[in-house]
């Protein structure tokens, strides 16, 4: 017992050091095994000291992590060049807000692809240079508060705040802004509680979509209603043109307003002209031993209980088949990801995010343009060697890997380059003529030329680099300031867990288009799916990191409620999941309400996808009626909205009985036409004027009976 007591005391001393945030340092890596016995003793202590259970469990994980890093450092200390030294492990307490008497500005962002975050950080960087006595903080909206009460408690303490808010899909907030947006838009009874807040909003959207910058507009309106003082008109960034120019114009309008708030009284000094630095990571080159460690780390990368974009599940492709007939000159793929035993789950109507690799031909072209070895193994660092941050604008670096892997997994190479990328290329162009041309394209004077030569021509980053061959940015610049991060592609899941619990089905049309420059654009993810090898064909099957994003595109909780589904082409995907779920209900004896599916394709002989399945759904009673529009069979083109008008009376009767309406597919064309048809049906069948009909349709949306999954 005395021995046990002594041992317990030493454990508590060790725990105290960890809790206080004091470094835990192993001076001799050879003694790493001793820490394994320490971990074992800690485990046994759990039984005797249950009050320390939570702390001890966490500490074991920390200690084991320390051991692994120490062993790796020791084994890789041969000929590595500029390998980062292992820093002492310090557990930091939660950062507390410190009132140092300085004025404070908070810059929030809600981003899906990183653009809003980039603009927020760019504003913060320049503002810090202009107003040195002010404290600026960049905040992810999802990290700002743990719950609704904390949102309100913290926001009412803000004096100056800026919101960078992207809108995507059917006028929806981004994933990291969804919780804030729901709370903020539902709080209509707060009164003018934000009278002390001065603010600005910059939105990111695409004018081709119906709900252009809806999220930014809604937040701006509510801020005014609740007493906040608008410093500058809401910025409406349009990604269909040059959103960087929109941001620049909004930012320039902001500075005079900020001067009146943040400049000290009597300070007449003119702000020093600010030039944004070209973003650059610090780069370390490693040897093969370091590469071996990272390969082991990546191989065990699925040990997560919660899967998201940062922690996806690497799923094998179980099934792949072509849905178009050989007569079709296009392609549509049915793909099934195997999630058996992973812990990854989904619900009918959810989306799956797929992180696909760039094509090898694309990567080869990038390697040629960079003129570097594909086997160069490196790591990126967002801080200097002394640990201080290089720039708050740098995105988190990806894990160490070789150059081919980095270009394959992480670099977006086929999108049109932003102006900031052209500036970065200009800084590393050895030919002065090329450097000046790149600078001109990125300048206000070159706005029209950039719009025509880059945006309208849809020139890819690699095409632009090929036009300026002397521009050879180093790795730190290329991955920080030239090539944006490759983003996941989202697909409506085309299955139901009631039928396919261990599979996620995807229905994907191949993207294969000729660009204005003559380049053939091959969609990154759709081409990967087209070329995927399923394990039903080979043990050496294809796999991809995936994760599930929840959706509100759900069937009514009451199965007897009528449903109207409208989805041409791959817009059929979520409705296939709906019908699988209804089939499972039918087979279990559940009574279903009326249902109709409006589907559209070009020709029955070419692209009537899932035709046999749809007929079986009708025969089983899972689907009451199937109405198909063929746009290329008759003398005139017929689309789903025409079929809707043919069934206007039936649709109105179903709506009158409480039906839910669902639309999935193209937001720019089809969804708008369907919306207009619905408006017309309400007018004609409901004997309403145009204003009342629009109000009726809007009420269907706000009450959750008119749902859209559009892109």
UniProtKB/Swiss-Prot annotation:
Protein EC: 1.6.2.4
Reactions accelerated catalytically: 2 oxidized [cytochrome P450] + NADPH = 2 reduced [cytochrome P450] + NADP(+) + H(+)
Cellular location(s): Endoplasmic reticulum membrane
Manganese among keywords: no
Regions of this protein lying in the Cytoplasmic compartment: 73-711
Enzyme class, UniProt record, top EC level: oxidoreductase
Top-rank taxon: Eukaryota
Transmembrane segments: 52-72
Annotated residues for binding of NADP(+): 330, 570, 631-632, 637-641, 673
GO CC entries: chloroplast; endoplasmic reticulum; endoplasmic reticulum membrane; plasma membrane
UniProt entry tagged with the keyword Isomerase: no
Induction info: By wounding and transition from dark to light.
Membrane topology: Single-pass membrane protein
Annotated function: This enzyme is required for electron transfer from NADP to cytochrome P450 in microsomes. It can also provide electron transfer to heme oxygenase and cytochrome B5. Reduces a variety of substrates in vitro, such as cytochrome c, feericyanide and dichloroindophenol.
Family of this protein: Belongs to the NADPH--cytochrome P450 reductase family. In the N-terminal section; belongs to the flavodoxin family.
UniProt protein name: NADPH--cytochrome P450 reductase 2
Organism the protein comes from: Arabidopsis thaliana
């Amino acid at each position: 017992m005395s021995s046990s007591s002594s041992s317990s005391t030493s454990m508590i001393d060790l725990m105290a050091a960890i809790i206080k945030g004091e470094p835990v340092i192993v001076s001799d890596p050879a003694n790493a095994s001793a820490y394994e016995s320490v971990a074992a003793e800690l485990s046994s202590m759990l039984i005797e000291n249950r009050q320390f259970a939570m702390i001890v469990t966490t500490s074991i994980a920390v200690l084991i992590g320390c051991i692994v890093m120490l062993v790796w450092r020791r084994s890789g200390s041969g000929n590595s060049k500029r390998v980062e030294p292992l820093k002492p492990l310090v557990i930091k307490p939660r950062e507390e807000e410190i009132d140092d008497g300085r004025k404070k500005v908070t810059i929030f962002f809600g981003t899906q692809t990183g653009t809003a975050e980039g603009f927020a950080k760019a504003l913060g960087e320049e503002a810090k240079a202009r107003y040195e006595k002010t404290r600026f903080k960049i905040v992810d909206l999802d990290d700002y508060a743990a719950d609704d009460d904390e949102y309100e408690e913290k926001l009412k303490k803000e004096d100056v705040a800026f919101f960078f808010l992207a809108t995507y899909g059917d006028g929806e907030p981004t994933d990291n802004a969804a919780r804030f947006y729901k709370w903020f838009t539902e709080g209509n009874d707060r009164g003018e509680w934000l009278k002390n807040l001065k603010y600005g909003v910059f939105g990111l959207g695409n004018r081709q979509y119906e709900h252009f910058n809806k999220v930014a507009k809604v937040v701006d309106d509510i801020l005014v209603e609740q007493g906040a003082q608008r410093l500058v008109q809401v910025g409406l960034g349009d990604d269909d043109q040059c959103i960087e120019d929109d941001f620049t114009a909004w930012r320039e309008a902001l500075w005079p307003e900020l001067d009146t708030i943040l400049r000290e009284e009597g300070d007449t000094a003119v702000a020093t002209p600010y030039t944004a630095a070209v973003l650059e990571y610090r780069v370390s080159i490693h040897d093969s031993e370091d590469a071996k460690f990272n390969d082991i780390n990546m191989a065990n990368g699925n040990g997560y209980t919660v899967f998201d974009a940062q922690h996806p599940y690497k799923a094998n492709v179980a099934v792949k088949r072509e849905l178009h007939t050989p007569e079709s000159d296009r392609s549509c793929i049915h793909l099934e990801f195997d999630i058996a035993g992973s812990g990854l789950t989904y619900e009918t109507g959810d989306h799956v995010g797929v992180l696909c690799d760039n094509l090898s031909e694309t990567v080869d072209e990038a390697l040629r343009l960079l003129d570097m070895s594909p086997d160069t193994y490196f790591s990126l660092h967002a801080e200097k060697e002394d640990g201080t941050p290089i720039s708050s604008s740098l995105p988190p670096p990806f894990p160490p890997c070789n150059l081919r892997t980095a270009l394959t997994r992480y670099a977006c190479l086929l999108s049109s380059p932003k102006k900031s990328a052209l500036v970065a290329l200009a800084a590393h162009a050895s030919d002065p003529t090329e450097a000046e041309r790149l600078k001109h394209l990125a300048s206000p004077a070159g706005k029209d030329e950039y719009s025509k030569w880059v945006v309208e021509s849809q020139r890819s980053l690699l095409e632009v680099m090929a036009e300026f061959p002397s521009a050879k940015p180093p790795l730190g610049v290329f991955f920080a300031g030239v090539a944006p991060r490759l983003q996941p592609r989202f697909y409506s899941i085309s299955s139901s867990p009631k039928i396919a619990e261990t599979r996620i089905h995807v229905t994907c049309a191949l993207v294969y288009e000729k660009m204005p420059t003559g380049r053939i654009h091959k969609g990154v993810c759709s081409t990967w799916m087209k070329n995927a090898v399923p394990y039903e064909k080979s043990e050496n099957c294809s796999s991809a990191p995936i994760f599930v994003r929840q959706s509100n595109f759900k069937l009514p909780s009451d199965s007897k409620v009528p449903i109207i589904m409208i989805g041409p082409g791959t817009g059929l995907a979520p409705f296939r999941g709906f019908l699988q779920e209804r089939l499972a209900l039918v087979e279990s004896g559940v009574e279903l309400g009326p249902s109709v599916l409006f589907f559209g394709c070009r020709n029955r002989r070419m692209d009537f996808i899932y035709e046999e399945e749809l007929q079986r759904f009708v025969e089983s009673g899972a689907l009451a009626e199937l109405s198909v529009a063929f746009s290329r069979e008759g003398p005139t083109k017929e689309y789903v909205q025409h079929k809707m008008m043919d069934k206007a009376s039936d649709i109105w009767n179903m709506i009158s009985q409480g039906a839910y309406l669902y639309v999935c597919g193209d937001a720019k064309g089809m969804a708008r036409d369907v919306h207009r048809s619905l408006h017309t049906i309400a007018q004609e069948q409901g004997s309403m004027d145009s204003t009342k009909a629009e109000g009726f349709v809007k009420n269907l949306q706000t009450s959750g009976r008119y749902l859209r999954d559009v892109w």
